[in-house]
Curated annotation (Swiss-Prot):
Keyword 4Fe-4S: yes
First-level EC class: transferase
Main localization category: cytoplasm
Gene: nadA
Comment on bound cofactor: Binds 1 [4Fe-4S] cluster per subunit.
Residues at which iminosuccinate binds: H45, S62, Y140, V141, N142, S161, H255, P256, E257, T272
Protein name (database record): Quinolinate synthase
Length: 367
């Protein structure tokens, strides 16, 4: 099977859904939700389109939604409006009699895909050879189940953008060094906030299979995987300088997946939840430039008309893979359930799920 045939198989939605009017699609979605009742749970990530998020039973970040799905024992079916690694995490945390569905299998995550399990295993072998048994692996929840399992197997834990600082401190209490993947920016920003100097960090390039950015490897405390979020890496210091010239007194708030330089220049930096709460609690009339995904920025702008809210990058596109989950695919997944056909089920092999859960549980035990 060639690549084009494989891509075609990833999107088997009947063409009729693509030509339906939005009003008909919305009516169909509401009807299925009503008929299924509590047997159906729809988590929606903050970065989802409004056309989809309106049907979410809960909105939040990836781990929060997976935990809510696991607690919702009445739900037989979980139609996850997010991306692939999020649905995987939901499958890991839910029971065997719950079914997790992703409306469009093409909804992946470029950052999660930057850490391939074979590359990670080769990197680990090289790092252990160089540094010995002095390393604790930490993995951002924005990662594949296979990488979470690897970290769980080697005594490490997952982290979120909210608890990365706490988890990094935990890892340092266990050993001398940290191997942080797949997002170098979250790792660098978190380590720096803990007092680790930039010259005490090195970047592992999985293609060159080399450590970069450190003159003295013996002083390295944090090894960062060379990965990034394609959305957040597009925010720049120049954009911050420009918005401050145009709007003196504006507050700049960014996600820690942005580069270190951007985070240092911003007024505030924190997780998606932190950004939402900061905007919600800000005084009326204040001005905000937000460095995160455009769907969320637009939603915050709509929800808080008493504040002036703009994107730090006015030319930013929404997360392309998040946007794969659209109303036609969503309705197709729901109506297929009604017809007794489960499309795009996400199932993590039991051995991988068990080790990935170890990494998740280590983090959750410290929450």
């Amino acid at each position: 099977m060639n690549v084009l045939e494989q891509l075609k198989r990833l999107d088997e939605m009947p063409k009729r859904y693509k030509t339906m009017e939005r009003s008909e699609l919305e009516a169909r979605a509401r009807a299925v939700k009503e008929r299924f009742g509590r047997r159906l749970f729809i988590p929606g990530h903050h970065y989802q389109k409004d056309e989809v998020i309106q049907f979410a039973d809960a909105t939040g970040d990836s781990l929060q939604l997976a935990q809510l799905a696991a607690k919702n024992s009445e739900a037989e079916y979980i139609v996850f409006c997010g991306v692939h690694f999020m649905a995987e995490t939901a499958d890991i945390l839910t029971s065997d009699d719950q079914t997790v569905i992703l409306p469009d299998l093409r909804a992946g995550c470029s950052m999660a895909d930057m850490a391939d399990i074979f590359q990670v295993e080769r990197a680990w072998a090289a790092l252990i050879e160089r540094f010995g048994e002095t390393i604790v692996p930490l993995v951002y929840v924005n990662s594949t189940a296979a990488i979470k399992a690897f970290v769980g197997r080697h005594g490490g834990a997952t982290v979120t953008s909210s608890n990365a600082k706490k988890m990094m401190a935990w890892a340092f209490s266990r050993n001398e060094r940290i191997f942080f993947l797949p997002d170098q920016h979250l790792g660098r920003n978190t380590a720096y906030a803990l007092g680790i100097r930039l010259d005490e960090m090195a970047v592992w390039d999985p293609h060159e299979e080399t450590l970069q950015g450190a003159d003295d490897l013996d002083k390295v405390k944090v090894i960062l995987w060379k990965g990034h979020c394609s959305v957040h890496e597009n925010f720049t210091v120049r954009q911050i300088e420009h918005i401050r010239r145009m709007k003196p007194g504006i507050h700049v708030i960014v996600h820690p997946e942005c580069s270190w330089e951007v985070v240092q220049q911003a007024d505030y930096a924190g997780s998606t939840k932190y950004i939402i709460e900061t905007i919600r609690n800000a005084p009326p009339g204040t001005q905000w430039a937000i460095g995160t995904e455009m769907n969320l920025v637009n939603r915050l702008k709509h929800e808080h008309p008493d504040k002036e809210i703009v994107s730090l990058n006015p030319y930013m596109c929404p997360c392309l893979t998040m946007n794969r989950i659209d109303l036609p695919h969503f309705v197709w997944a729901l109506e297929s359930l009604e017809q007794g056909a489960i499309v795009n089920r996400i199932t993590v092999p039991k051995d991988i799920a068990a080790e990935a859960k170890e990494a998740l549980d280590r983090m959750l035990s410290l929450a």
